[in-house]
Amino acid sequence: MSLRFVIGRAGSGKSTLCLREVQEELKQRPRGKTILYLVPEQMTFQTQQALIGSEDVRGSIRAQVFSFSRLAWKVLQEVGGASRLHIDEAGVHMLLRKIVESRKDGLSVFQKAAEQNGFFEHLGSMIAEFKRYNVTPSNVYEMWQQLDAHSSSAEQKLLANKVYDLQLLYDDFERALIGKYLDSEDYLQLLVEKLPQSEYVNGAEIYIDGFHSFSPQELEIVRQLMICGARVTITLTIDEKTLAQPVNELDLFYETTLTYEKIKQVAREEKIEIEKTIPLMEQPRFHSPALAHLEAHYEARPNEKFNGQASVTISTAANLRAEVEGVAREIRKLVANEKYRYRDIAVLLRNGESYYDVMRTLFTDYNIPHFIDEKRPMSHHPLVECIRSALEIISGNWRYDAVFRCVKTELLYPLDVRKETMREEMDKFENYCLAYGVQGKRWTSEDPWMYRRYRSLDDTNGMITDSEREMEEKINRLRDVVRTPVIRMQKRLKRAGTVMQMCEVVYLFLEELDVPKKLEELRIRAEESGDFLFATDHEQVWEEVMSLLDTFVEMLGEEKMSLSMFTDVMSTGLEALQFANIPPSLDQVLIANIDHSRLSDVKATFIIGVNEGVIPAAPMDEGMLSDEEREVLGAAGIELAPTTRQTLLEEQFVMYQMVTRASERLYISCPLADEEGKTLLASSFIKKIKRMFPNVKDSFITNDVNDLSRSEQISYVATPEVTLSYVMQQLQTWKRYGFEGNLDFWWDVYNFYVTSDEWKQKSSRVLSSLFYRNRAKKLSTAVSRDLYGDIIKGSVSRMELFNRCAYAHFAQHGLSLRERDIFKLDAPDIGELFHAALKKIADKLLRENRTWSDLSIKECEHLSVLVIEEIAPLLQRQILLSSNRHFYLKQKLQQIIFRTSIILREHAKSSGFVPVDLEVPFGMGGTGSLPPMEFSLPNGVKMEVVGRIDRVDKAEDENGTFLRIIDYKSSSKALDLTEVYYGLALQMLTYLDVVTSNAQMWMKKGQAASPAGVLYFHIHNPIVEMKGDASEAEIEKEILKKFKMKGLVLGDADVVRLMDNKLSTGSSDIISAGLKKDGSFSARSSIASEQEFNVLQKYVHHTFENIGKDITEGVIDIAPYKMGNKAACTFCNFKSVCQFDESLEDNQFRTLKDMKDSEAMEKIREEVGGE
C-alpha cells in the first residue's frame, strides 16, 4: 500500500505519464492485477479512447476507466448492495415533493417557498450536498438545537427555522430511502463501506487523474482505495514551488495544494507509505511559445509581456450571433487551410443558455460537426407536455391554457388523420373556444355546443344557417377528439385508490392515444430530414417517462394520494427529466462549459462570451443557504460546499485551466450586445491577456461586411446556406451605391446561386426580395368593384378609417380581415351596453309620455338595474353572467348607468332641448330610417353613407326649430376641427347634416330645422376630490361639472341658453360654452356660426366624395397618418399584415400638421369655397 503524487503545472504531461505507465504495464503484463483509472465523469469517454489509442494497446480487460459513481456500480455488483432500487434526479424531486406536501403545515420557512420554480431542484441539491460532506440528519438536528438556543436577531432566527425545516425534510427523505432505494450520493457512501470486501479492487494499481479537489465523501473513497490498493497514484495541478511555501488562499494553486495536504494527512492516518512526489517541469503540451508563456507566467505580478508572434487572438463582436459566426468561419478556415480535424478544436463558454441554440443553428448551417456537452431538459417535448397538461386539465377544472397546451402537442390527434388538416381545424376550434369562453363544466357536459355568427345585441334573434349548422357539427366532433381521452382518464383517476393505480391510468392514457406509434412516426420523420439528434430524442423520452412511472410506483405505489398532489409530484418529476448526451463521434468540435469540462489533446480553443460578470463570474447567492449562513454553519463545525467568496478565489484557477487547454492556438472573444441588443462589457480578463501580449491586435467581428477589406470579405464566403445572406447585403449595397472594382468576386458568388441546379430555385425566393418594395399596388377598377360592389354602402367610421390609412380600410372592408374573437369584455361591448341601456330607459319614458326630468333618484336607480338585468344575458354570449368577476363588473356598469341617468335628469331640468329620438338609423331601410347620404361618383359608382345616431335633441323658440346631436362616449372626447379637416372626425357633422337636411320629412310638423350643435356625452361614474367637509349638494355639483359636454355649438346666446337655462354669465356646467357680461361668448367657448356649420357640412360632403373616388379607383396605399403623438398605427389591428416599417424607403407616415381651430376652419373654407 503506497501513495504517489504526480504534480506539475497545466500541460506538463501528468495524464500522459499515467496513461503511458498503464499502456506499458498492459503491454508487458496484459493479464495482471486490476488497474483502475479514476477520472471525473465528463472525462471517462475521452480517457477510455486515449487509453486504447496506442498501437500496442487496442483493448483491455485488466485496465478500466471509471468515475467514482461507475466504480460504485462495479463494486456493488460484485459484493452486493446493488439490489436496492436506484432513484435518479427526477425520482428524488418527486419524493421530495411528496414529503414537502405532507409536511407543509409543519414547515417554518419553506411552506410558501415550495411553490416557487426551482425549489425542489435546490432542495435536492442541498440534501446531496449534505451527503457529499458527510452531514447526517442528526448532525443537522443538533445544529438546529444549537442555533435555536442562541438565536437573538431576526437573521439568526431565520437561519434556525431554515435549518429546522431542512432537518425535517432530510430526515423524512432518508427514512423513505432506507432499505429500499439508493440515490446517486448513497452509492458513493456504500462504495466506502463495500470497498474493503471487493476482490476486484484489492491489490489493484489505482490512478486518480483530472481532479482538483475532493468532497469529504470522495476523500473517504480515496482513503479506502489507498487501504485496498497496491498503489494509488494521484495527479494534481500544482507548481512544485508552491509546496515549498506556506499555503496562501490567494495562490493560483491554493485549492489543489489543500487537496494535496488533505490526502497526505489521510495517508498518514492510515499508515500508508507516501512515495516520493514526481514533479513534472517541462511543458510538452504547448507547441506555441506564446501559449507556453501564458501558462508559465499566468499568475505573475506584474504581467510578463510576450513580444514575439503570438498565437493568441482577441476579438470583440457586434453581437452574440456575429461572435458565433466569427468562430464558425475561423473553424472552417483551420480545417481547410491548417489541416486541423474538428476534434482538435474546442469551444469553451460559461453562459450556455444564451449560446447553445444559436450555436446549434449556425454550426449546422456552416456544416461543422459539433457536440454540445450539456444535457437538455425534456420539459418541452410533446410527450412530457401532453402528460403534464392533461393532468392540469383534470386537476385545474379544464382551464383554456391547459387544454390547448395539450392539444398543441398533437398527441390527441387520431393516428390516421392528416396532421396539416387537423392542425388547421384545431386552430379554428381554438378560435371558437376563445370566442365563447369555453372552460370548466362546458367541456364535460353532454350538451352540444352551439355556434352562431353573432356578437352584437341586434343579432341575437337570427335563425341558424346551413353554414352555421355545418360549423356546429365540426366543432362538436373536434370537442370529442379533445375531451374523450381526457375524460376517460379523469374518470379512471377518480376511481384509482393508490399511486400505482394512478400511474396505470397515465400509462393507459398514453397507450390508447397510440403515443408509441406517434413517437415512432416523429422519429422516422426526423431521420428522413437528417436530424438524428431529435430522432433519438423521441426514443429517449418514451423510455424516460416509462422509467419515471416505474420509479413513482416503486417509491409510493401503495400510498393514497389526492389528484392535486399526484399532479404536482408527477409534474416535478417530469421537470427533472433530461436527454442523455450521445457520446461524441470521432471528429466533432467539442462545445463545453468552462466549469465542468475536462479537455485533452486539443490544438485550438475558442473561449467565447468573455464578458464582465461572466468570466470571471460575478458573485451569486444561489440555493437554500446564503454565504453568511454557510459561514455560520462552518464556524459551528458543519463543513459544506465553498461559499461565493471561496468560489471567487478559485475562479483564477478555473480561468488558468481554461487558457491552458490548447496546444497551438487560443481565441478569446466577447460580444458587445446580447440577442436583445442590450449592451455588454468586455471582461477585465481580456485586459490581462492584452497586457501579456501587447502585440496582439483586437479584431472586430461584424455581420455587416461592407466596411471590410477584400480578403476579410472573402472569409464570409462559406456554405451556400450562410453565404446567401451576405450576397444579399452586397447586392443591396450595389443597388444603392454600385460595387467597387475589387469586390467583384461577389458577382461570381451570385452567379453560383443563379446557375446551380440545387440552389437556383431556393435562392430566387431570397434574391427576389432585393427588389421588394413594401408598397400596395393600386387595385384595378374591376377588382375594386368585385371587392366593394357597384354600390358602396359604408358607415362614417369606415370613411374615417380610409383617411387614417387606406390600407387598413382595404384590409378590413376589402379583405374582410378581423382579429380573433376572444371572450372578453372590450370597450365596444361596454359602449354597446351603454347605448342599449339608455335607449331602453328613454323608450320607456316615451311610452309613458314622460321626460328625464320627471324621474326621481329612486326611479333612476330602479331603471338602471332593470335595463342592465335585461341586457346582460344578450351581451357577448352572456359574458356578464359567466363569472363572479364579470358579475361584479355588471354591478359597476349598472352604477355608471345610474349615475348617467341622474345627470341626464339634471340636464333635462336645465335645458330647453328635449330628445326627439335615440338610435336614429339612416340609410338602413325599414320604417323610421332616414335616407342615406348619397353620392354619385365620377366613375359612375354610387356611394351611400349610412349609420345610426345616438340621440337627436330638439328645441323651439320664436326663431325656429333647432336640432342638436348628442353622441354617447365611454371616454372623454371633443371635436377637433383639425381632425375634421383631415377627414378623421366626420361622424358628428355627418349626423347633424342628415337630421337637418331631412328635418321637413322627418319632423312631425314638417318644419325645417337649423343646426344647434354637436356634443359628446361622456358616460362614466367620476370620482371627485373635495377639500374640507363638503356637503352632498356641493359634491353633486362638482360631479355635474365632470359631465360637461364638449363639442361645437351654434354661436347664438339664445340657443346656448336653451341648452343651459341656468346660464346668465360665466361658464356653463352643461356645455363647453360661456357668456361674458356684455352677452358675447367667452374665449374658451366652442362655437360656430350658422354659416360655418353650413361650410362644415359642405366640407363633409366634399370629403366623402374624395374618399369614395379613391376607394373605387383602388387606392390602398400603406400610408398611415401621424399628427403629434397620434398615429394610425397605434391601435391598428393590421400592423402584422401591412408590415409597415419606417426604415424602408417606401414606408413613411403621412405627417399631418396640427392646427388651431380657426386655422383649420379657414382651410376648410378654402376647400369648399365658403365665405
Curated annotation (Swiss-Prot):
It comes from the Bacteria. GO terms for molecular function: 4 iron, 4 sulfur cluster binding; 5'-3' exonuclease activity; ATP binding; double-stranded DNA binding; helicase activity; metal ion binding. It is an enzyme of class 3 (hydrolase). Keywords: 4Fe-4S, ATP-binding, DNA damage, DNA repair, DNA-binding, Exonuclease, Helicase, Hydrolase, Iron, Iron-sulfur, Metal-binding, Nuclease, Nucleotide-binding. The keyword Metal-binding applies. Despite having conserved helicase domains, this subunit does not have helicase activity. The heterodimer acts as both an ATP-dependent DNA helicase and an ATP-dependent, dual-direction single-stranded exonuclease. Recognizes the chi site generating a DNA molecule suitable for the initiation of homologous recombination. The AddB subunit has 5' -> 3' nuclease activity but not helicase activity. Belongs to the helicase family. AddB/RexB type 1 subfamily. HAMAP family: AddB_type1. Residues 1-287 form the UvrD-like helicase ATP-binding domain. It holds the Pfam family UvrD_C. Its EC number is 3.1.-.-. GO terms for biological process: double-strand break repair via homologous recombination. It comes from Bacillus cereus (strain G9842). Its cofactor is Mg(2+); [4Fe-4S] cluster. [4Fe-4S] cluster binds at residues 805, 1129, 1132, 1138. This is ATP-dependent helicase/deoxyribonuclease subunit B. Heterodimer of AddA and AddB. Residues 281-587 form the UvrD-like helicase C-terminal domain. ATP binds at residues 8-15. Binds 1 [4Fe-4S] cluster.
